[in-house]
Amino acid sequence: MMRKLLFSALLALATASTVHAGGLMTNTNYHIAFDRMFARAATTEIDAAYSNPAGLAWGHEGWQLSLNFQKPWQNRDIDCSVPGFLGSNFDKKYNGVASAPIVPALFAAYKKQNWAFSAMIGIVGSGGFVKYDEGIPMFEVPIRAMLAQAGMMPDKYNYSANMKGKQYIYGAQFNITRKINDNFSAAIGIRANYYDGYNRGFVNANMTAVPNNIDLIDLQLDCIQRGWGFAPIVSFDYHNDNLTVSARYEFRTKIATENDTRTLSARIKNTDPQTAAQVPYIEGATALQQFGDKVAAYQDGAETRYDMPSLLAVAVGYDFTPQLRAALEYHFYDDKHAKMAGDRQKTLEHGTNEFLAGIEYDINKKFTISCGGQRTDYGLSDEYQQNTSFACDSWSLGLGGAWNINEKARLNVSYFCSLYSDYTKTQANYQGTPYTGTEIYSRTNHVIGVGIDYKF
């Protein structure tokens, strides 16, 4: 039993790398026009370099550039409740603070007659940092249960834990667009994706009695993961006066990261009365061997998969008047066939479905306002949700505006937020203990953005 509890704690620490921001593995908000309208897959403006490359066949003749900056704030909290735990109730909220510095994205496009060439650089997957200053339930509950088995109740020792992780997928995309006739265009492209992440954490428990202050358990992990992948992209666009219909397909990106493990260690107080005098601690390779093949995935040089799923995006846009435009859009991410660590993708009920709508209105020649919404359904299951990686279905709302500074320059500003549905998971034999526990996963998300578009 003790070995099982210790394994649960170490495994939680070792899998902390799967914490990420954004969707399951994909971001779509690169340009500020998306943040203030959402449905942008039928656009012919500069942000089409990502959302509708084929649409650039009807875009600005010559060069265009766009530089965008976003600042996100997120919370990812876990409410844990274990009735009757160690003779009382265990109720604790673990606050996860997810943040990122200013997130930039750069767009460029050049069109001449029937040809267009475009590029985009940004954070295309995951994105951000997350930190739990008090660890997570997968740390605390099994360790407290293990120490209670050895006769040590919570008032006899100090417990501390910390977990933080980073997960970015940087992308550089290049497209070639061809106008086929007066109504149809097509584009092909490729995106290079670079995964850069780490997970660092510790769990420590020591006796409060002085002068001994004996360490009972100490777990440490510092693992950096990096890897490359490439995604071909095809898109098509139909344009007829006020109507635009588009489709874009991104192929699955295989990303196999390689560990650069700086620290992977366990030090455990030996409570076996027959051997404790000679070997007071189990540590080093001997301690890790107790956990079998499970820790092998986090050894230096080991590989972990973080595939980005294939994506189908279809949209229709319509200009009701020269001043009023609207669009509807649908995304399908085939998450069930994008390999994740431990094959977790197989536990999803289905791939991610997203429904988007947006409207934009030109007040005059200088100012534009817009708003939009998005519904995201991940197909989540209890088996998929983990302390170290969880998602919540959401509604997102965005608004903002644009200022045409002159004929060449446009300033975009935006704000959007996501309203998440809490996910409740109840588990018998919670974290390897004989108790039933319940976890409630919740999230918040707010993003402000500013960007400048420039036409040469």
What are these regions (language model features)?
Residues 2-3, 51, 174:
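Residue-level micro-sites within transmembrane alpha helices that shape
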Residues 17-126:
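N-terminal, post-signal peptide beta-strand-biased segments of exported outer-membrane/organellar beta-barrel
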Residues 15-16, 64, 185, 424:
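Hydrophobic alpha-helical membrane context
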Residues 13-15, 60, 178-183:
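Long, low-complexity, intrinsically disordered polar/charged segments
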Residues 1-21:
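Gram-negative bacterial Sec-dependent N-terminal signal peptides
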Residues 11, 69-71, 415-417:
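A broadly conserved detector of short glycine/acidic/proline-rich loop/turn motifs that flank catalytic sites
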Residues 22-39, 44, 103, 109-456:
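Outer-membrane beta-barrel porins/channels
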